[in-house]
Structure formats: structure tokens, C-alpha cells
Amino acid sequence: MAAFERNPSRWKGTRFRRGLGASRIAAQAILSLTEKQSQGRWPSFPLGLKSKGTFRSASSYLLHQLIHRSHEAEAEQEEKQQEDGESEESEESEMQNLEDKYDGILREETVAEAITGLGWSGRGTEQVYLNLNLSHCELVDISILCGYVHLQKLNLSGNRIEDLSCVSCMPYLLELNASQNKLTTFFNFKPPQNLKKVDFSSNLISEMYDLSAYHTLTQLILDNNEIEEITGLENCISLTHLSLAGNKITTIKGLGTLPIKVLSLSNNMIETITGLEELKALQNLDLSHNQISSLQGLENHDLLEVINLEDNKIKELSEIEYIENLPILRVLNLLRNPIQTKPEYWFFVIYMLLRLTELDQQKIKVEEKVFAVNKYDPPPEVVAVQDHMTHVVNSMSQPQRIWDSTLPSLDAPYPMLILTGPAACGKRELAHRLCRQFSTYFRYGACHTTRPPYFGEGDRVDYHFISQEVFDEMLNMGKFILTFNYGNHNYGLNRDTIEGIARDGLASCIHMELEGVRSLKYSYFEPRYILVVPMDKEKYEGYLRRKGLFSRAEIEIAVSRVDLYVKVNQKYPGYFDAVINADDMDIAYQKLSELIREYLGLTETAAKTLAPTADTKTSYLKCEDYSRKSSTVEFLDSTDRNYFTKLWAKLSSKKSPVERESLHRQHEAARQALMGKTPRDHTLLFQRGPVPIPTVSGQQYFATIDELQKTFELSDDLFKTPSGTYPETSKDSNISKRYSTYFHTCPWSKELPFQLPEGGISSRPGSAGSDEVDGALKALRVASSMQEKVAQHKRLSAITIMDPGSNTKPTLPPIPHGRR
């Protein structure tokens, strides 16, 4: 190593010389050997001297030997290369000879290597091999398999076989795979007794033959052949899986009533879906890559779970209706169809087929199903919410002002009475009679509708009959409080109708269907809802037929909706404030008028019950005795409790300094209004028509004696019953009864953050004629105090017997005190 490190060039030269060839290496070895021999032959001279002649002869001899050895090495190398070429040629010739000798005939050695599955024979008497796999062996002749009678599974796929007659010798064969061969016919062998699965795909079969002898066949695969017609399967009574993909079939027929569960007919030339009517067990259907343009023919397959219609010509969304009623359809593939270009395709298909879990090879999310339902068939609650949102947004286009239906009291929303029930159940007649009897309190509010008037109906009396164009224009302008659709006709409650009634100081009495009630419940109005429903559906149906205004379909819908109203009343207690049986209109109006009288405080005692009389059927509406006895009391008293709860929640919540300052200004404005002071100039911008102001704690001012006298005269008219005025008992009690409505005490007035001026009812300061009404004022003051004591006693007694949580029912505020 040291020598190489000192002289690296010498080391490199040595490596180079060693790599030159075998001849030069041999020459170097001979040269070293010659040197040693010469040293032993000639004695060494002293001082290292040699004779010149001897040196020359030795050099020539070495050169001669080197050249000779070099020629010998080159000759040996040429001989070796020649031998290698000859060996390669011999190997190629041997391989060619072997190929020439292999003729595709199956031999014992090959079978021995491919046979597996040691088990018992069909008779169970001996152990044999049951499975043989000879796939992709380039076999042509398999006649040797005639001796393998115990085989149960035979795989011959990927060969060049043209004849399967040897299968006739396999009586116990269960499965046969002869795909990817050169068969031109199928089943040209004696049928094994229990043959179940056969695969003849990717052959040259062009025609199907009678397979009546193969009654045990359960699976038949004939893909990628040249079959044009399905025949010979009528008696395969056990066939459950049939695949004929990749053929030339144009019409589906010949399947009869087979128990097929899986059917594949993809990559054919089918244009219409026919011949599947009797396949009642069909579960999986593959008709992809055909020319189908309609889904007609897939109806009435109750067990169908998977449908593959990829790459066809389905265009219209209406085609989905043919598979809409398939109860357990889970997977549908409509990829590469013109129907996919429809903008509503995805959600429409999901809505029509809500049971789907996979569409076009994509999992369907729950959110997509909810969106689809809300888009195409939303629940009634969603419709009501959308309707309310539409009107709120559209109303922003109208000039913003304080509505006439906005009462000055924080705890008294505008009073409304809603009668609801099925079509032509009598709610409109009840509303008209009620408004005629209590004309100083109620006015009928007519809705707008796009339907034509029935016989006997008057425009602006029963409805405002308008065209669809006018209705849409009013809707876009935000003039409706609510709208709903019933019987393919639109109905709407116009805000101007309510404001016109409120401007005259009256409460609104309106009738509508349940859809309108749902929408109205989302608005800021809080009316009283009274359900008018016929209990005897047969009598109700006969009444509709006698009217002669409705078709048979409309009558059936109206009668069926009776159960809907009853179901809502039972499922949502408190949804309606009262229920009235509409089988007899006279009895129904008697109950309704009693209810309104108690509500207005026009009778001495409250009605004991709102339940129908003993001769009226009440099987649809069942309630407990306690609820029947207390229904009137709750109907009358729960208003104050409900609104006091709402008001107290608002007043007791923690408020910011800005909110407290705003409330202070509101209370100050209310106090000044009650004291009769003129508001500031800027408040005149929000003036409106005269609206009755409910009396609070019996406080009311009169400017002159004429106003007080007019009030007395008006009260005489208000409290007259149809049969006359109430009997007089005493002066104080008479005054108390006649003016109890005017001096109705607000139960939470003492808890409000402002105090009303003392003195009860008195003439306005500075007004003339105050001495003339002292007697009347004293009497009214006595009546007011008595009324307050009685009301306080009733409240205390009601609180003592009240169940916990019963004060949270949504009810309406007191109705205002008549026309001013």
C-alpha cells in the first residue's frame, strides 16, 4: 500500500495493463518464469555485469513466446463465442420442438397439478377431489375429464375449448365456468342432476335453446355473446340470476313468471321496458347502456331495490312517477341521461323517491331530503312560516306608519275573533249572525279570494272576489297579512280590511280555513280561535250534497278534513280557544253567543260549560270533566294572566340605559295622553283616525256634560239583549251592570311603572257643567269601586284553585268597549 501511495501512476498503469487481456497476463507470467530460469542457468557475474550476447538472445526468445501465447488466447476466445452461439440455437430449436409437440390436449399431469378440494363423493362412500381449476391453460381437448365423475366445481375459463361433451359424465357437477372460450352452442351435454351455476360469457353463442331439463339452474351468465332473443327459459323454475349483458337483444321477452331476483341486460339495443310485468321477485335490475327513453314498465315491482339505467335516453322528470311507488327502492343510477341536465333534477328525484339512499353513485344526505321536501311539498308549518316571511318582506314596500290596529296600551293587542272549520260547516253564517247581534263590538272582515262566487254570495259582503292577476299584484305590494291556498284557489286577509274595522273602534270577526290559522299564528296579532266542526260526518256530507255547489271530489276532501281539525285539536291542546259542534246551527250559535256574552261581560254569571248538549255526539272530542267545567273561566280569565306574564317578562328583564330612557319616554307620553295633554309637535306626524282607548283602573275624562250623556245613552243601547234590557234591582247594581264594560279593571295596572291620576272618573279640568254631573259621578265612582272589589275577589279565588302552569295558555286581550 505504501508503494502504491508513493507512486499512484505506477498503480494505475498496473491496473490498466491487467485489464488488457488474458494473453498479455500469460506473457507476463512466462516472462517472470524465464527470468527465474535464466538466473538459475547462468551464474551471476560479479558487480552485476552480464555479457551482451546472452542478453540479446534471451530478449528475442521472450518476445517470440509472448507473440505465440497471444495468438493462442485469441483463438480460444473465438472458439468460446462460437460455442455460445451454437448453444442458443440449440435451445431455441428445443423450445420450437416443444411447442410443436403441445397440441392443447389435457393430460393427467396437468390435472394432477390443478385439482383441489378433497372431500366426500356424492354418495358419501369415498373421499375424492371435488374442484378442478384449468383456467388460461390454452386447452382445446378436455376429453380426459370424462373419467372425473366426482367433480363438483369445474373452471375452464380462458381456453380454446369448443366442445363440452365431457360434462355429461359429471353427474354431481354444481358449478361450471366456461367463459372466454370458443363455444358456439351451450348446454350441448347431458344435464347434471344438480347443476346450479353456469357461466358461458365471452363466447360465440348466437342462439339460446330449450333449457327445460335444467330445472335446478339458479344462475345463468351469457354475457358478451351474439344472442338476439331470449328463449328457452320458461321452465327454469329455480332461475334467480340471469345476465345477458353485451348481446344484441332488442326486446325483453321470454321470461314469463320466473323467480328472477337479479337481471342484467346492459349493453344491448333495448328501447322499451317490457316483459317484466310478471317478475314479481325482481330485486336488482341493470338496463344500462341501452336506448331506453321511458321508465314505463317498472311499476308494481314491490321488491325492486336497485335500478341501473346509466347511459340511456331518459329526458323528462315526469318519468320518475313510474317508479314513485316502489316501496323499497334504495339505489338509482341515471348517469349520462338527458334528464340530468334539468336544473331541478337532483332534488326532484330525491323528493319523489324519499326512500333512496344512493342516487347516481352518490350517497344522499339527510339535509338534502329535508330541503327537497320543504321545496316541493312542505309541511303546513313550513308553508305558514314561508307565507309569513313573504308578507313581512313585501310589506316593507308600503309606507311605514303606526297602524290603526295598534292600541296605545302595551298589554292590549288588537282584538280579533277567528272562526275556523271545514268548508261550508256554517262558520260564515255564524260570523254574520254574531256581527249583526253584537254590531257595536264586532264587524265582519271579508277575505279576498280568486275563486268565483257561489250562488247567493255577494261581493264585499262574503268575500272580495278578485282575479289572480290582482291577487298577485296585492301580494307583491305587501297588502296581505296572510294568504293560503285551498281547493286550487287563493285566499288572503287584506290589512286594509283590518285597519278599516279598527279605525271605527271595532273588533274584527273573520272566518278562514286551518291553513290561514297557521299563518296568522306567526303574525303579531293574537286573536281568539274558535273551532266550528261538525261531529256527524254523514249529516255534514248530506248537507254538502244538497247545496249542489261542490263536486264529489270536493265533498270527499271537505269531509276528510273534519278528521284533520279534530286531530289538530287533540294533538295540540290549546291550539283553539273553544270548540263548538256545528251539527245544529241554532245550538251552535247559542253556544257561540253565550261565549261572547261572557267574554264581553254582558251576563251576570259565566256559562257553566261549552260542551254540546246531551243529544249531541261528542265522540270525536273527549276531554275531562274538570276541563269542561273550567273552559269558560279559562277562556275569560286567561287573557289577563297571559298578557300580564308577557308584560311582566318584558318589564322585569334587565335593560340598558338607552332602553330605560326609551321606556321612560313612552310612559311619559302615555301618562300625558291619559291626562288629556296635547302631544308635542313631532308626534303629530303619526296621527291616525279615532281608535277607542281601553279604560284603565276606571279612569275616564269627559270634556262636557254632553259627552257623559252620550256615553250613558250609548251604554243603554250596548246592553240591550234581543228580548229587552236586563231587570233593574237597585240603582247601584243597575249602574254596575250597565257600565261594567266601560270600567273594566286592568288586573296589573297597579304594577305598572307609572301611576294614573287619582279621582276616578271626573270631568276634564276647566270644563263647564261639572256641578251638573256630581250625582252621576258619585254613582259611577261607587260602581267602579264595587266592580274593582268584585274583580279582585274573582282573581284571588281563581288564583287559589289554579293549577301550576295553567297561566301560560295563549289567549286574547279584552275586546274594546264598542263604537265611540
Swiss-Prot record:
Q: Which Gene3D superfamilies match?
A: P-loop containing nucleotide triphosphate hydrolases, Ribonuclease Inhibitor
| Binding sites annotated in the UniProt record for ATP | G421, P422, A423, A424, C425, G426, K427, R428
UniProt GO molecular function: ATP binding; kinase activity
Q: What coarse category fits the chief subcellular location reported for this protein?
A: cytoplasm
Ranges where the LRRCT domain occurs: 337-375
Source taxon at top rank: Eukaryota
Positions annotated as LRR repeat: 129-149, 150-171, 172-193, 194-215, 216-237, 238-259, 260-280, 281-302, 303-324
Q: Which InterPro entries match?
A: GK/Ca_channel_bsu (IPR008145), Guanylate_kin-like_dom (IPR008144), Leu-rich_rpt (IPR001611), LRR_dom_sf (IPR032675), P-loop_NTPase (IPR027417)
An example of a Pfam family matching this protein is: Guanylate_kin
Q: Where is the composition biased (Pro residues)?
A: 811-820
Its GO biological process annotations read: axoneme assembly; cell differentiation; spermatogenesis
Query: Tell me, what does this protein do in biology?
Result: Involved in multiple aspects of sperm assembly including acrosome attachment, shaping of the sperm head and in the early aspects of axoneme development. Not essential for primary cilium biogenesis.
Q: What is this protein called?
A: Leucine-rich repeat and guanylate kinase domain-containing protein
Its taxonomic path starts at: Eukaryota, Metazoa, Chordata, Craniata, Vertebrata
